[in-house]
Structures are given as structure tokens and as C-alpha cells.
């Protein structure tokens, strides 16, 4: 999920990062659509590697939002095949396809999965109730409904979790479909397909990241490989940047193009005709897609992140890593975002402004290869804490202005004269309910006054979405109004109706009297409270005026001291132990703790912790300090997860809320360490994240643990739980306040049941390796078949292969599922009408990644050839000098611009490439030679007026020789004077430079040498 609204914000701020996908139309012959020629040239430009985050395909295919879902699981799998085939025809990878399905996630992610799945089960229950009500209404109208339709339940989307029968069926189906394409599609003959199903631990996108890091570690890796990843998650953008593979792009649906489409509810999908279903299928097949070009985003960021007057060389790669890290505070899948940060409010720009103002005072960047410099992080967060109060006030003012603007628009709309399409104009402050001719409230309506609607606005919204607790609240208010209405009606006489000079109807007259009566009751209640308050004794009643003055002065002084020296008050009563927190006795319903916190008013700090954690004021320091420690551990874990892989499978953030920014102080000396641990088994994760309502996805032996009152872990599966809206408007944005899982108790109870599992159930509860499938036309086919499957092969033999021959590296071994040559592979889908396949047409093997020789380095590899720049000098200047509209409303979704025929070309744009060196990492040796010139360049900024920022000059020198990232100021393209052979024309000069090189690339750095320090060789 990542950062909400991040893609929308990013594409508006940097409009040239996106371009439309060009799809080749299918040819019709006698009404039959011919398949697209996969082997033909790609109108979007050629691509080497494609990575599919399959959960982003499986979810919309199995439970679509805007149309009836597939009838059976087989139909769902066929829909997955159809969608995947369309994506592949758009991207057309030529070398490698990685299909990654979410496996068991780290514990840090399970908390979010648990919240989603509990809410998903509740939403499914509401949808089933709505479906049953619709069926009852139809039967009351005399319609005959088949039992199969009437008893149909909403398919449980929680089945898309590792370990369920559906995920097992999906894995088998994906392996068959891949083999079918390799055996029958000529365009796939050289494609190598890696399938990492749900039995392989790890999230899909992070298994893809592990694969890319492994390929980069191979000595023969081509640094000019083009990559593309498909998916809708915002964190794919961060992952693309974190690879430091500039030839990278993201393929995704154009969700903005679908914003205006009608949203069908349950009733719409039930009543949908076959013609309407066909129309929706046609619309879905024409949904537009977008490219998001990481290379163009890097160009924008080179201008956005460029900072003068640095005491150290500007390093674009590390600056990008800092930018990615700052985005984590605005939202991620593992930690709650900081209360003062929201992407919609340009919070990333706020953090960037702080970073650029502080960077010259820092000794180095905040991040380095996935590790944090806590001193630098503390300085940035401390400055954010100083601005926090102003951010809350600004947000409140903007909300008020937005609300007032909406009210004005609403009022203007209601006062319009009807043109035949508008409803009858009504007064702004009148919202009458439905009444019959006798003045009684019509059946099915809520009797609410205007003040009730304002007071219970949030409950009304949630009630309309089916929330039971909100419905109860609204019904109670309505019942009170009904009682008052009956009381008023009994008191009215015929003269009251006759004296009606304004010709009100009976319903209108009763409504007005109800409003008046409620105002009287509220006034009486207010007077009673004032009277009680006046009878209470004063705090300081004394006849002596001087004593009174002294007491008032003492109170004022004490109040000032409380406000100015909060850390010194009641030091003896402050509790240093971390307090136990609770939900304040709230076990269900929808709440909004932000209403009581009032972040925009003074004193919000203490109110925040008291209202959300239900603790005493003297417990706040201990709690906030522990939360800060856990949160810093969390962002350290997330950064390592993105750049090095999972640092710990068992760590998680133990709170539902984030600390306030002003509490991030004195954490620079934290000693952050993680224990790797091991991932849960699939059934253990299912027991951690599924509610009892989804227990049918588990083997039967586990279900009593989730539903029986005698279960030792029954408290992990509440049927009712509170949801804190936390100041948000939409119900899905609320926080489900579920209890955190006790790992020891859960694993003990779960593992005690393993002995009762069947063999098939045990098979689904294992950890496996990915599989590699190739066609019999692949360059490695004969070698792999001979060593692994033909007569005389060694048992348990592992074959290591490298990148040079097939553009893929790894370790293969015999398939554990019993693949054999000269056999048949049947289709696992009954209704698919797909044939049996001969196993001589393809090869299936177990696949393992090459082990990394060392920690991954956040650098561009040797031999990289830059792409042609996409941005003009005007684009760069608009970023650097902040003119125009600060990056927004410029060229929004302007696909009229020429995007180099929609293709971002991959070098050579100039005549040079990176200089290779032993070790495979460039480490900015070239810029190391220019340290002296860099310092002179900084002195120009300090002593004279700053020179014009020239794109990737990186505040080095302005001499003529320019390398990568140093465009010609006059021509606006990349030029460079340093030469290197690296990976060009098949030479092995990649990751390890001279260690296994051929030809002149083996020179490494010896032909040039270098001067000055490198951060990896000191």
C-alpha cells in the first residue's frame, strides 16, 4: 500500500515522469480476435526484465469493485491469466520474467495485514446482509429467486493469504500457464520465467528486490539492463529508486482515468444484465495504463536535491536515498505516519526544505547503504518538531476554509432556480424528513433535525456505509425525536393548525415545533449547568483584597511556570517505567480521538497521549520516550528492508499510533540491533492475521482455537473491536484497535495441532524455493537437461550459472515436485479448455539466488551508459528556483508532449560510460579527483553570487570534461571525457571489474588511477 496519494502527488509535481502505454490493437478475422504477435517489435521500446507483483493482479481479478465477481475460483484464475497476458503484451520482456506472489510476511507487516483482514471480514458480513435484504425485497415483490443465487455468499478475499487452498491452486495454475506459454508462443522461446509462489517467504515486491540485488552481485551482470515492475503500490517507486538501476520503469493502471466511472453497489451488481456485464468487460479491457520512468524522476530529483555550500561532495545517489527515507515518515506499511505529516499537505516538501537547510551543517548524509546516521536524523526531526504546532494550526485553518467553501457552493446550488434537472429549490437550513399526509414519519426514515445532522455527521456517514454501531446511535437520536414529536402532537389542538398563517403542511409544522422544543430543552440544560456551577464555592474567597491579589499572582506565576518549564514540574511524581496502555474500556464502535485531542490548540501534546493511550499525565514522558525508541528502530528496520533485505523477521512496532514529532530528541546514541530470526510458517501467519470468520481457510484442527471459548488464545480473535477515525473522513482510513499477537502463546497453541494435519495439509505448510521454467529453445536447455534430468545425472546436484550467456544468474537443481522429461502436464483448471503439455517442450527446475558477496552498495554499477535526458533547462530551472506554480498544475496529465516517441532511450547518449574498477562499484572515483575544484566551487557560492545551477553539475567544477550526470550547459545533453570499456558488446567488465574481465575492460582503474578519498576504500 505504501504512502496514500503519493503517486497522485508525485505525478502532479513532476509531470514528465509518466507517459501513456501504447497498446497494439488485436486484429479481427471473421469476428475472431487474433493473438498479438509477442515476438514483434514493442511500440513502447524493448525491455529486458519484467517483474510482476502478482497480488496486484489477483485481488482485482478475484473480487473486482465495479462488476460482479467471477462465479468460481477457476473463473478467477482464468481472469488472472487474461490480465497477466495483457500486461505481458504491453511490456514484452525479452530475457527474464519474475512472477512473485506474496509469501509469509515479516512480523512488522503482519500487524497491518491483521487489521485489513479483520475489517475485510466485517465488510463481507455487511455485504452479505445487504444481499440478503435485497433478496427478501425481491421475494416480497413476487420474484422467484433460485436457491443457488439466494444463498450465495460474498467470496472471502482473505483467502489470498499464504497457506490457503486457493493460494495452492493459484501456484499450480501459474506454473501450468507459464509452461503453456513457453511451449506454444514463439515470442517466449528465449524468456526465462521465475515463479516465486506463496510458499517462498517474503512479500512479492521485496522478493523481486532480493532478485535484483542478487543479479547486480554477479560479475557478468550487464549494468545497462532495462527493468520494469508492474504494480499499484506507491512503495514500488521507492523500490525502483533504491535499486540504483536508472534504466527502470513502473507499469501501472491509470487509476485517474477511472475516477469518473460509476461505482456499482451490491444491488447494481445483482441486477446487472448480461449486456451490462459485457459492456463492463469491454471497458476493463480498454483501461489505459501508464509508464512511470524512474530515470526521469532521477532527473527531477537531481535538481530538487541539489544543495550548495556543502562541506562534503554532493552525492546524488545518497541524496536520493535520503529522500526515500524521509518519505517513510509520511506513510509506509510497517509504521503509522507521524501525525503532522500528510502527503496531501505537501509534507514531503516540508521535510525536503528542512533537509536542505540542515545538510550543510551535517557531517554526512542521513543514510548510507540502508544504515542510518542517527545524529543527522535527530537534527532533521528536531526541526520538524519545532514546526509541528504551526503545521497543526495551518491544517485546521485550511480545513475550516475548505468547509466554508463547500458550504458556500452547497448554498449556491440549493438556491439555484430549477431548470428541469435540478430539484425543487429549498432553503439552506431546512432538511425535512419524509412524512405522510397525517404528519407521521414515513417508514424507513430517520427523524433528525438539522442540528442532529451537523452533530452526528460522522455517524451518519458511517451508518450509510452499514456500520452497526453508528446505525444504533442514529436510531437512538431518531427515537428521542419521535418521542418528542408524539408529545408535541398530543399537545396540539385543531386551533394550532387553523392558526397556521404560513400555510405549512402538518409535517412542516411538526418539524418546526420539534426544532423549537429541542432548543428549549438544550437551553434548560445549559441553565441548570450554570446554576450548579454558580453554587460551588470559589477557590479563593477572602474578604482581604490584598490576599486575593497575592493568590491571583501566585496562580498566574504557577501557570506561567507550567507552560515554560514543563520538564521541571512534578519531577518527583513522573513515572519512568513504560506504562500499560488500553482502549479506555471501549470494545467496539467508531470513535475519533482527534476530536478530544484538538491538535490545533495549545496543550495538544499531553492531550494526544492521554486520549489515545488512556494514561496519566505523569506517565507521558516514559511512554513517549519508549515510543520514540521503537519508532526509530522501525524506520531503521524499514530502510534496511528496502536496501539490504529483511533485518529481522520477528521485530514489529508495538503501538497503533506514532509519537509526536517534538518528542524525537536525544535518540542519537541508541544502539539499534536486530536479530534475524526466521519467518512464520504459512499456517502460523494465517493464525496471526485472520479473524474467526475466515477460519474456513485454515485446516479444521485450527478453527476451535479461533472460536471456542475454551481456547487459550481466544482473546486474539475479537468479533467486535473499536475503530479510531483518528481525524480522517473515510471509514477505510480508520485505525482498527486490535490486540497485538503474543508470538509465544500463538506458536505454542498452533504447533500443538500439527500432529493432526493430513499429508496434503502439511504440504501447504512448508517453505520452498522459487522455480525456473525455460523453453526447449533456450541457450541453457541442453546443459540443464543433461546435468539435471537425463540419464547419468547426479542426485542433489546444484548447477551455478552466470549472467553472460543468458542474462540470468543463479543456482538450479532438480525439481522437488517430480518433473520428468517425456511426460505430460495436465491443465489444473477444469473449465479452461487448455490442453495437456508435453514436458519435452519446457524445463522446470528449483532456483536459488546467488549469495551476495557483501552488503549491497547504493551506487550505480560500472559500465552504465546514461539515457538521453528528458527534461529541458526550463524544467530544471522551475524546480531549482521554484517559479511557476511550485511544480503543480503544470502539464498535468499532458500526454500531448512528445516523450521521445513514448520511449526513454537507453544509452549510449554520449560517447562515454562509467569507468570500471575492481570491486564493481564506481564509488565516485572520478569526482574524487575533483575534490579540490569542488571546494573552490563552494567558495564561489560563499564569496560571490551563486552561478546558474547546471542540472547534474553536483557543485563540483565547471571545467569542460564532464562525466555521467554532468550535462553540457549549452547543448543540454550528456557529454563526458573519461573513457571506460566496462560492459559493452558482451565484455565482462561489470560488477567486479577486472577480476574476471575479458579484453581491455580488465584494465580496471589502473589505466587512470585516482586521487582523493572514497567512502568504501579508506
UniProtKB/Swiss-Prot annotation:
Q: Which Gene3D superfamilies has this protein been placed in? A: 1.25.40.1050, 3.40.50.12390
UniProt-listed PANTHER family: 5'-3' EXORIBONUCLEASE 2, 5'->3' EXORIBONUCLEASE
Q: Which Pfam families match?
A: XRN_M, XRN_N
Checking InterPro entries in the record gives:
5_3_exoribonuclease, Xrn1_helical, Xrn1_N, Xrn2/3/4
Q: Name one GO biological process term.
A: termination of RNA polymerase II transcription, poly(A)-coupled
Subunit details for this protein?
A: Interacts with RAI1; the interaction is direct, stabilizes RAT1 protein structure and may stimulate its exoribonuclease activity. The interaction also stimulates RAI1 pyrophosphohydrolase activity, probably by recruiting it to mRNA substrates.
Q: Where is the sequence biased in composition, kind Low complexity?
A: 997-1018
- In Swiss-Prot or TrEMBL terms, this protein is called 5'-3' exoribonuclease 2
Q: What does this protein do?
A: Possesses 5'->3' exoribonuclease activity. Required for the processing of nuclear mRNA and rRNA precursors. May promote the termination of transcription by RNA polymerase II. Essential for vegetative cell growth and chromosome segregation.
- Stretches with biased composition (Basic and acidic residues): 519-534, 948-984
Top-level enzyme category: hydrolase
Q: Which residues form a coiled coil?
A: 121-147, 468-541
Q: Which UniProt keywords apply?
A: Coiled coil, Exonuclease, Hydrolase, mRNA processing, Nuclease, Nucleus, rRNA processing, Transcription, Transcription regulation, Transcription termination
Q: Where in the cell is it found?
A: Nucleus
Q: What is its EC number?
A: 3.1.13.-
Q: Where is this region: Disordered?
A: 402-424, 519-549, 939-1018
Look up the record and report any one GO term of the cellular component aspect: RNA polymerase II termination complex
Q: What is its main location?
A: nucleus
**Organism of derivation:** Candida glabrata (strain ATCC 2001 / BCRC 20586 / JCM 3761 / NBRC 0622 / NRRL Y-65 / CBS 138)
Amino acid at each position: 500500500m505504501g504512502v496514500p496519494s503519493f503517486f497522485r502527488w508525485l505525478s502532479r509535481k513532476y509531470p514528465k515522469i509518466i507517459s501513456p502505454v501504447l497498446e497494439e490493437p488485436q486484429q479481427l478475422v471473421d469476428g475472431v480476435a487474433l493473438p498479438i504477435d509477442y515476438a514483434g517489435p514493442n511500440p513502447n521500446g524493448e525491455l529486458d526484465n519484467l517483474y510482476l507483483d502478482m497480488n496486484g493482479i489477483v485481488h482485482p481479478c478475484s473480487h473486482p469493485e465495479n462488476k460482479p465477481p467471477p462465479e468460481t475460483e477457476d473463473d478467477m484464475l482464468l481472469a488472472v491469466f487474461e490480465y497477466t497476458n495483457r500486461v505481458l503484451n504491453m511490456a514484452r520482456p525479452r530475457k527474464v520474467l519474475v512472477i512473485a506472489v506474496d509469501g509469509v510476511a515479516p512480523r512488522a507487516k503482519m500487524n497491518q495485514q491483521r487489521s485489513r483482514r479483520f475489517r475485510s471480514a466485517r465488510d463481507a458480513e455487511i455485504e452479505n446482509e445487504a444481499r440478503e435484504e435485497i433478496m427478501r425485497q425481491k421475494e416480497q415483490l413476487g420474484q422467484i429467486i433460485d436457491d443457488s443465487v439466494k444463498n450465495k455468499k460474498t467470496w472471502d478475499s482473505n483467502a489470498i493469504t499464504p497457506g490457503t487452498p486457493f493460494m495452492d491452486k493459484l501456484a499450480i495454475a501459474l506454473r501450468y500457464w507459464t509452461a503453456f506459454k513457453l511451449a506454444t508462443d514463439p515470442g517466449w522461446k528465449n524468456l526465462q520465467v521465475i515463479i516465486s509462489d506463496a510458499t517462498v517467504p517474503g512479500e512479492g515486491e521485496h522478493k523481486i528486490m532480493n532478485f535484483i540485488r542478487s543479479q547486480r552481485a554477479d560479475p557478468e551482470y550487464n549494468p545497462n539492463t532495462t527493468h520494469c515492475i508492474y504494480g499499484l503500490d506507491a512503495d514500488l517507486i521507492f523500490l525502483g529508486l533504491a535499486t540504483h538501476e536508472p534504466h527502470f520503469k513502473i507499469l501501472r493502471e491509470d487509476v485517474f482515468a477511472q475516477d469518473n466511472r460509476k461505482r456499482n453497489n451490491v444491488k447494481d451488481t445483482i441486477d446487472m444484465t448480461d449486456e451490462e456485464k459485457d459492456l463492463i468487460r469491454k471497458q476493463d479491457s480498454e483501461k489505459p495504463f501508464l509508464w512511470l520512468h524512474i530515470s526521469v524522476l532521477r532527473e527531477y530529483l537531481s535538481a530538487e536535491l541539489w544543495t550548495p555550500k556543502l562541506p562534503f561532495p554532493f552525492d546524488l545517489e545518497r541524496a536520493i536515498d535520503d529522500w526515500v527515507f524521509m518519505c517513510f515518515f509520511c506513510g509506509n506499511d510497517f509504521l503509522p505516519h507521524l501525525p503532522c505529516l500528510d502527503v496531501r499537505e505537501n509534507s514531503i516538501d516540508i521535510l525536503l526544505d528542512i533537509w536542505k537547510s540542515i545538510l550543510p551543517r551535517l557531517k554526512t548524509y542521513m543514510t548510507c547503504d540502508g544504515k542510518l546516521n542517527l545524529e543527522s536524523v535527530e537534527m532533521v526531526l528536531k526541526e520538524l518538531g519545532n514546526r509541528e504546532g504551526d503545521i497543526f494550526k495551518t491544517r485546521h485553518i485550511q480545513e475550516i476554509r475548505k468547509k466554508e467553501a463547500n458550504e458556500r457552493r452547497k448554498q449556491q446550488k440549493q438556491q439555484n432556480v430549477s431548470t428541469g434537472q435540478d430539484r425543487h429549490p429549498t432553503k439552506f437550513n431546512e432538511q425535512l424528513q419524509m412524512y405522510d399526509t397525517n404528519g407521521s414519519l414515513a417508514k424507513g426514515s430517520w427523524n433528525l433535525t438539522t442540528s442532529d445532522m451537523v452533530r452526528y455527521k460522522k455517524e451518519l456517514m458511517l451508518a450509510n456505509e452499514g456500520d452497526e454501531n453508528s446505525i444504533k446511535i442514529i436510531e437512538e437520536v431518531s427515537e428521542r425525536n419521535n418521542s418528542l414529536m408524539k408529545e408535541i402532537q398530543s399537545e396540539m389542538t385543531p386551533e394550532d393548525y387553523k392558526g397556521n398563517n404560513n400555510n405549512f403542511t402538518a409535517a412542516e409544522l411538526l418539524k418546526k415545533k420539534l426544532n423549537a422544543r429541542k432548543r428549549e430543552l438544550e437551553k434548560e440544560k445549559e441553565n441548570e449547568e450554570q446554576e450548579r456551577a454558580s453554587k460551588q464555592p470559589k477557590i479563593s474567597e477572602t474578604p482581604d483584597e490584598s490576599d486575593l491579589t497575592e493568590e491571583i499572582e501566585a496562580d498566574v506565576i504557577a501557570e506561567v511556570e507550567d507552560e515554560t518549564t514543563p520538564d521541571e514540574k512534578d519531577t518527583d511524581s513522573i513515572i519512568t517505567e513504560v506504562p500499560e496502555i488500553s482502549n479506555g474500556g471501549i470494545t467496539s464502535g467508531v470513535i475519533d480521538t482527534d476530536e478530544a485531542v484538538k491538535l490545533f490548540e495549545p496543550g495538544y501534546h499531553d492531550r494526544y497521549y492521554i486520549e489515545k493511550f488512556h494514561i496519566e499525565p505523569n506517565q507521558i514522558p516514559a511512554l513517549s520516550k519508549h515510543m520514540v525508541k521503537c519508532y526509530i528502530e522501525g524506520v531503521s528496520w524499514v530502510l534496511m528492508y528496502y536496501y539490504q533485505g529483511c533485518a529481522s523477521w520477528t521485530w514489529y512496532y508495538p503501538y497503533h499510533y506514532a509519537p509526536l514529532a517534538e518528542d524525537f530528541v536525544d535518540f542519537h546514541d541508541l544502539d539499534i540491533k536486530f536479530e534475524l530470526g526466521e519467518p512464520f510458517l504459512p499456517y502460523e501467519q494465517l493464525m496471526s492475521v485472520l479473524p474467526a470468520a475466515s477460519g474456513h481457510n485454515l485446516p479444521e484442527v485450527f478453527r476451535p482455537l479461533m472460536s471456542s471459548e475454551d481456547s487459550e488464545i481466544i482473546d486474539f480473535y475479537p468479533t467486535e473491536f473499536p475503530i479510531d477515525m483518528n481525524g480522517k473522513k473515510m471509514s477505510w482510513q480508520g485505525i482498527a484497535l486490535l490486540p497485538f499477537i503474543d508470538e509465544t502463546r500463538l506458536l505454542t497453541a498452533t504447533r500443538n495441532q500439527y500432529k493432526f494435519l493430513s499429508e496434503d495439509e502439511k504440504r501447504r505448510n512448508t517453505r520452498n524455493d522459487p522455480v525456473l521454467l525455460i523453453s526447449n529453445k533456450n541457450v541453457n536447455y541442453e546443459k540443464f537437461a543433461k546435468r539435471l534430468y537425463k540419464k547419468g545425472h547426479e542426485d542433489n546436484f546444484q548447477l551455478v550459472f552466470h549472467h553472460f550467456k543468458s542474462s540470468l544468474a543463479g543456482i538450479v537443481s532438480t525439481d522437488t515436485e517430480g518433473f520428468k522429461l517425456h511426460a505430460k502436464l495436465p491443465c489444473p483448471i477444469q473449465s479452461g479448455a487448455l490442453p495437456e503439455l508435453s514436458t519435452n517442450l519446457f524445463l522446470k527446475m528449483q532456483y536459488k539466488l546467488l549469495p551476495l558477496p557483501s552488503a549491497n552498495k547504493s551506487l550505480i554499477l560500472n559500465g552504465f551508459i546514461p539515457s538521453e535526458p528528458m527534461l529541458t533547462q526550463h524544467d530544471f530551472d522551475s524546480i531549482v528556483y521554484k517559479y511557476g506554480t511550485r511544480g503543480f498544475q503544470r502539464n498535468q496529465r499532458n500526454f500531448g508532449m512528445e516523450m521521445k516517441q513514448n520511449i526513454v532511450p537507453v544509452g549510449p547518449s554520449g560517447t562515454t560510460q562509467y569507468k570500471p574498477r575492481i570491486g564493481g562499484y564506481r564509488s565516485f572515483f572520478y569526482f574524487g579527483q575533483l575534490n579540490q575544484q569542488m571546494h573552490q566551487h563552494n567558495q564561489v557560492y560563499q564569496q560571490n553570487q551563486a552561478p546558474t545551477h547546471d542540472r547534474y553539475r553536483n557543485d563540483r567544477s565547471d571545467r569542460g570534461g564532464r562525466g555521467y550526470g554532468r550535462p553540457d550547459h549549452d547543448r543540454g545533453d550528456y557529454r563526458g571525457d573519461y573513457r571506460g570499456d566496462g560492459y559493452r558488446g558482451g565484455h565482462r567488465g561489470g560488477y567486479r571489474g577486472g577480476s574476471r574481465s575479458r579484453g581491455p575492460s580488465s584494465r580496471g582503474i589502473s589505466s587512470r588511477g585516482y586521487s582523493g578519498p572514497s567512502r568504501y576504500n579508506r
